[in-house]
UniProtKB/Swiss-Prot annotation:
Protein location: Cytoplasm
GO molecular function: ATP binding; metal ion binding; methionine-tRNA ligase activity; tRNA binding
Listed Pfam families: Anticodon_3, tRNA-synt_1g, tRNA_bind
Protein's UniProt name: Methionine--tRNA ligase
Residues annotated to bind Zn(2+): 145, 148, 158, 161
Annotated motif 'HIGH' region, positions: 14-24
Length: 670
């Protein structure tokens, strides 16, 4: 089975300042299943990835560890590659953005943008650390909250009261890096003039390159108006210097997606493949990116505009997935559910997770929840109980009674053909990234096979020597049906498929190799392909995750002494009201702000809340929350905020307060 199609597939590049966790693996497993599906179809499908190895966090972490950024990123890259290999995630090339290939391509693209008039210079003001002599991102400034007087709060929001503000609003601000008091300073930055490409992007986003949910989201951003994109950072910075501009570097988000091209360029140089065939503006090949919903803006707006403006092809499609939650909540270090890949591997088989994620991924942008009771049930009941059990039950008789040789004919060709008839539908489900549908169809087939074996009862027939031929035929049938099932599951379970090929004594299985059954064929002695999940191992994994990630005590957020106690009269001054969120939209140009319109029954108020990273706008609309209704309005650069919504936080997540059923907009909270 061969095809003339040529495809290049990428996953988002993991950041090179920490180890992989299960949230990363959702995307990389999703990508790997899709690539394996196409390779089994005989399509030239090349997958590349690499580490995102630039930026301030990497520079500072390396300094903290007393090593160079190059040494840090090299070490993390090895860790990432080791984890990917353990989970059978098999990229054709895995590179790094800190590479000669990426520097050449980033410089080329920038110079083409500059020559085309797409780069503009603007002066901006931000906090500057006079000791470290560097500009400070918001998260590298801390001080006392201007709202509640809680100390040691970040420069963009307070984790005690939930207020959002600018770093310059902090009381007694200090640099997280040096402890010095920062000063405001101007700097000239380089911007990509994204609004010039608004019509091109509108056209591109409406031609089926994105999921419908993403296209709808982009429509909101178009309505709000596109902004020029800051693509430069000031020294000191770990990244590529902008040619001819002293002390200026490309922002990490400029060269990170170019890293896809750089990884492929390295692959081409080593394999003799044409880079231009895949990246030329007139390319007939296909280009696919798998990304999380948090980086859609970069991949569906900046990236295609930058490619088109610099003379390269644009993506065939950008496929977006949701976030991973654990037991219905965001991953949490304190609960032990922030699980690193290495902690999982210390206790559980990697293909349990591949199977579970496949059973939940549906091609939409929905979040995926890892529920451990469901995890145990799906693996034990479906994968082990239904699929592996078929081979186990039938192979025992073939191994012991028939010298490992299958019979010379099938006793139920119709059932064999019934399972084969599901092939196109299973392939279609995998290709459309609806892996959950594929798994359901495969398990339906497995049910039919188990019903066949249960109805024929070879273990009963085997007690009668005169019926051994029937036992032989039934078990031969079972082995051939298992062969079909494991072929269907091969993109999801490549390790188990390989072990099955060895057991079946067959060539590598692919979509077109299973039409002809194995008859009068010698198989090998069966060895267990997969064992059941033990709940104790899950508990041990959670304990390890909690212990390993909580070695540093969490600093308690406490307000200043005089603010510890208030009188009931003081509390009574705060007018807390039930509010209904009638509209929500992310604030363009602000990392964390969401603009909320709140209905108080007899009036509506606008509030800016720092919950953008915790919630999508769509999930907020219509829900009830609690707001401070008599807070003095505050003018921000995005508009006037007329109150504050209440949320809880542990430093790892933000959780909006929501009243019980029966509460109505405008009710006082007492």
């Amino acid at each position: 089975m061969t095809s003339e199609r040529k495809m290049l597939v990428t996953s988002a590049l993991p950041y090179a300042n920490g180890h992989l966790h299960l949230g990363h693996l959702v995307e990389h497993i999703q990508t790997d299943i899709w690539v394996r599906t196409h390779k089994m179809l005989g399509i030239q499908c090349i997958s590349v990835c690499g580490d995102d190895a630039h930026g301030t966090p990497i520079m500072l972490k390396a300094e903290q560890l007393g090593i160079t950024p190059e040494a840090l990123t090299a070490e993390i890259k090895l860790s990432h590659e080791k984890d990917f290999k353990a989970f059978a995630i098999d990229y054709d090339y895995y590179h790094t953005t800190h590479s000669p290939e990426n520097q050449v391509l980033a410089t080329t693209i920038f110079e083409r943008l500059q020559a085309g008039g797409d780069i503009v210079k603007k002066t901006i003001r931000q906090f500057y650390d006079p000791v470290k002599q560097m500009f400070l991102p918001d998260r590298y400034v801390k001080g006392t909250c201007p709202k509640c007087a809680a100390v040691d709060q970040y420069g963009d929001n307070c984790e005690v009261c939930g207020a959002t503000y600018s770093p310059t609003d902090l009381i007694n601000p200090v640099s997280v890096i040096s402890g010095a008091s920062p000063v405001e300073k101007e700097s000239e930055h380089y911007f990509f003039d994204l609004p010039l490409y608004e019509e091109l992007l509108k056209d591109w986003t409406r031609k089926g390159h994105l999921q419908a949910e993403v296209t709808n989201k982009l429509s909101e951003w178009f309505e709000a108006g596109l902004k020029q994109w800051d693509i430069s950072r000031d020294a000191p910075y770990f990244g590529f210097p902008i040619p001819g501009v002293p002390d200026k570097y490309f922002y990490v988000w400029l060269d990170a997606p170019i890293g896809y091209m750089a990884s492929f360029k390295k692959y081409c140089d080593e394999r003799g493949v044409s880079f231009d065939e895949f990246w030329d503006k007139a390319s007939k090949t296909e280009l696919y990116h798998f990304v999380g919903k948090d980086i859609v803006y970069f991949h569906a707006l900046f990236w295609p505009a930058m490619l088109a403006a610099s003379g390269f092809r644009t993506p065939t499609a950008v496929y977006t997935h949701g976030f991973l939650t654990v037991e219905g909540q965001k991953m949490s270090k304190s609960r032990g559910t922030f699980i690193e890949a290495r902690a999982y591997l210390a206790h559980l088989h990697p293909e349990y997770l591949r199977y579970y994620f496949a059973a939940k991924l549906n091609g939409r942008v929905d979040d995926l929840d890892l529920n451990f009771d469901d995890f145990v049930n799906r693996v034990n009941a479906d994968l082990v109980g239904k699929v592996v059990n078929i081979a186990s039950r039938c192979a025992g008789f073939i191994n012991k009674r028939f010298d490992n040789r299958l019979s010379s004919e099938l006793n139920d060709p119709k059932l064999h053909n019934d399972l084969l008839s599901a092939r196109e539908s299973v392939i279609d489900a995998f290709v459309s990234r609806d892996y959950a549908r594929a798994i359901r169809q495969i398990m339906d087939c497995a049910d039919k096979v188990n019903q066949y074996i249960d109805a024929n009862k070879p273990w009963v027939l085997a007690k009668d020597e005169s019926k051994l031929n029937e036992v032989h035929a039934i078990c031969t049938m079972g082995i051939n049906l298992f062969r079909i099932l494991i072929t269907y599951l091969k993109p999801v379970l490549p390790m188990m498929a390989k072990a099955s090929e060895e057991f079946l004594n067959s060539e590598p299985l692919h979509w077109g190799s299973i039409d002809k059954p194995l008859l009068n064929h010698r198989i090998n002695t069966f060895k267990p392909l997969m064992v059941r999940v033990e709940k104790e191992k899950i508990e041990a994994m959670l304990v390890q995750s909690k212990e390993s990630l909580m070695t540093t005590p969490v600093k308690e957020n406490t307000p200043v002494e005089d603010a510890n106690l208030i009188s009931i009269e003081d509390f009574a001054k705060v007018d807390l009201r039930i509010a209904k969120i009638v509209n929500a939209e992310p604030v363009e140009g602000a990392d964390k702000l969401m603009r909320l319109i709140l209905d108080l029954g007899d009036a509506q108020k606008q509030v800016f809340a720092g919950i953008k990273k915790a919630y999508d706008a769509e999930e907020l609309i219509g829900r009830l929350t609690v707001m401070v209704a008599n807070l003095e309005p505050r003018t921000m650069r995005f508009g006037v905020s007329e109150g504050m919504v209440l949320a809880a936080g542990d430093g790892q997540g933000i959780y909006l307060l929501q009243p019980d059923a029966g509460a109505l907009p405008g009710m006082k909270v007492k």
